[in-house]
Amino acid sequence: MAVAVRTLQEQLEKAKESLKNVDENIRKLTGRDPNDVRPIQARLLALSGPGGGRGRGSLLLRRGFSDSGGGPPAKQRDLEGAVSRLGGERRTRRESRQESDPEDDDVKKPALQSSVVATSKERTRRDLIQDQNMDEKGKQRNRRIFGLLMGTLQKFKQESTVATERQKRRQEIEQKLEVQAEEERKQVENERRELFEERRAKQTELRLLEQKVELAQLQEEWNEHNAKIIKYIRTKTKPHLFYILGRMCPATQKLIEESQRKMNALFEGRRIEFAEQINKMEARPRRQSMKEKEHQVVRNEEQKAEQEEGKVAQREEELEETGNQHNDVEIEEAGEEEEKEIGIVHSDAEKEQEEEEQKQEMEVKIEEETEVRESEKQQDSQPEEVMDVLEMLLHVAVKNVIAEQEVMETNQVESVEPSENETSKELEPEMEFEVEPDKECKSLSPVRENASALEMENEPEEKEERESEPQPEPVRHLQPLPQPEPEPELQPEPQPQLQPEPQLQPQLQLQLQPQPQSQSQPQPQLQLPLPLPLQPQPQVQAQSQPQAVLQPQPVSQPETLPLAVLQAPVQVIQEQGHLLPERKEFPVESVKLTEVTVEPVLIVHSDSKTKTKTRSRSRGRARNKTSKSRSRSSSSSSSSSSSTSSSSGGSSSSGSSSSRSSSSSSSSTSGSSRRDSSSSTTSSSESRSRSRGRGHNRDRKHRRSVDRKRRDTSGLERSHKSSKGGSSRDTKGSKDKNSRSDRKRSISESSRSGKRSSRSERDRKSDRKDKRR
């Protein structure tokens, strides 16, 4: 390390000597010592020279010039002042007055009297020339004057040509001197700049060398200290303590060797760090020198460009003065070269701009593609979410259906015997028809299952409303809506074989009389001549309640039915020997007793309608089958008596009224019996179709289907017996010609009373909802 310190010290001394030489060169060039501290004013003057100085120095210099009086004043003040300006305005006013005065004078002056004067004779040019030719003295005089004028003009011409030549020479000499002076000045500036740069570089080298010397000295001191410590044993704990024993043993000898190894490793690491630090310090000035060289190259190029521009300007001036065509051609060539260079630069810039625009367009396209992909992913994810929701709804619906079936089985087993006894009183003549359970299972769509799941959730609320109402509500108007004809692709299924009745038109009148809420209120009575198209198609159960009355009324605004309704197959319905004129079906929605209606017209689905409504309603109503059948017997008897009284009061002849009442009562009972039988058959078909797909509930469903078959057979036999008696009664009612008009009147009256009752029912429902809230 001692050798390294010596070498560094030698380098430092050499650098100091070179710095001294640079300072001497600067002193020769500038005439002053760069190490001397200059006064502030002199420094500002030096900085504000040509091309140098900025900021406050230049401002102070300007102030100095303005104070000395050599330069222009700081602010040109108006010496004359405001009075002179006002006086100028006054002058302009006076001038304007003087201009306007002559006009006024012309107006004021009186007109002069006209006078006739003889004109003087003008001498012609010929007369004048003749007079001059006659005078010889005048000729001589004119010649002398002309000669003098020509001589003076020639002298002026000669003098002007000589002056222009001298001026041209002087201008050329001055231009050359100026160019030389500029070159010398630039050289001096470059030398001065280089000298100062050398001085800075030398100073940085000196600083680095001084730092290196200091580091080397510190390293030497550290090495000397550690060389003394290496003979001792170092403790493993920190802070490290160095000790030595008076008597050495092999264990202590091992400890000394270990400590020496550790210390030597520490010395080597410290040496490596020292060498790396010195290398870094040497690399820094190299980088600075490289940057300085680059700056010098740039400056040299700028100087060359300025010199070339100066030469081109000199050539242009010479060519303007001398008018040499050859030089003109050279200047044009030089200008063309410059224009080409400028055009190349412009073309390069345009190419760069085009490349940038292309890059931007590519980026925009990539962004648009990414956005489109994201939108597609979102669209793909949306149907997946919809399918998940549908699966959840189906799962919930299946659970609810299983639970309801278990409850229905228990209720139906208990109510088989009393329901058969009670329904036997109500059953009237009915047509036989077949039900296909396999088609029912196939025709049901998952959309209907979703709707059934939603309606199953609403059924508990309806049960609570039924429990809260001890008295039945007034009659509701149920209007069948005409269903639009389905698409031609759907083929109608084969018609069932029906037993026609020759004498009576195929209409069944269902009379249902509500139980009075109070004794003072009148009991509205409604009649419905409803054609029952009996279809082999799977049908929805619609159990008629004692408060619901079906009326065929003309609908002013036909409603658009859902897609499930439009897809239902069309069937030509033939009943009692009468073919309906139009191939339309009137979908009637089954109305629940406690259901709140917002619209004035309630759409009700009867047994004659297709599979448009879901199975959930029929299942929900199957629970209350026994209670409804009990009330049906009393309602049928009361409806028959009320129908006789109403028809007799509205008709003109007593014979026609009695026949009409008997026919209406028979038709109403037959309609109710048909609905009961059809609902039982459809429910049995549904149970059969479901029992096939569910293996774990086969035993229970088998028992239930057997019970229902028994009920169906007994109901059909009774309907056959009652149909004969009903047909004989209907023949008597058909003899009267005016029966149809009377029926229409009764329908209109019943519709009015039903509308009133439905409005009062809405008010009660709204009151109940408000109380619950």
From Swiss-Prot:
What is the annotated role of this protein in its UniProt record? Transcriptional activator binding to the E-box 1 core sequence of the E-cadherin promoter gene; the core-binding sequence is 5'CAGGTG-3'. Capable of reversing CTBP1-mediated transcription repression. Auxiliary component of the splicing-dependent multiprotein exon junction complex (EJC) deposited at splice junction on mRNAs. The EJC is a dynamic structure consisting of core proteins and several peripheral nuclear and cytoplasmic associated factors that join the complex only transiently either during EJC assembly or during subsequent mRNA metabolism.
On this chain, the residues bearing N-acetylalanine are 2
Picking any one GO biological process from the record gives: mRNA processing
Q: Where is the composition biased (Low complexity)?
A: 500-529, 537-555, 632-686
In this chain, where does the modification Phosphothreonine occur?
A: 124
- N6-acetyllysine occurs at 238
GO MF annotation terms:
DNA binding
What name has this protein been given in UniProt?
Pinin
Crosslink Glycyl lysine isopeptide (Lys-Gly) (interchain with G-Cter in SUMO2): position given as: 109, 121, 137, 155, 157, 228, 280, 304, 311, 359, 365, 584, 592, 609
Coiled-coil annotation reads: 2-32, 163-234, 287-379
Assigned protein family: Belongs to the pinin family.
Q: How does it assemble?
A: Found in a mRNA splicing-dependent exon junction complex (EJC). Found in a complex with SR proteins. Found in a mRNP complex with RNPS1. Component of the PSAP complex consisting of RNPS1, SAP18 and PNN. Interacts with PNISR, CTBP1, CTBP2, KRT8, KRT18, KRT19, PS1D/PNO40, PPIG, RNPS1, SFRS4 and SRRM2. Identified in the spliceosome C complex.
In this chain, the stretch annotated as Disordered covers 46-139, 280-386, 404-555, 595-773
What is the organism field in this record? Canis lupus familiaris
What InterPro entries does this protein map onto? Pinin, Pinin_SDK_MemA, Pinin_SDK_N
Modified-residue entries (Omega-N-methylarginine), positions: 54
Ranges of biased composition (kind: Acidic residues): 330-340
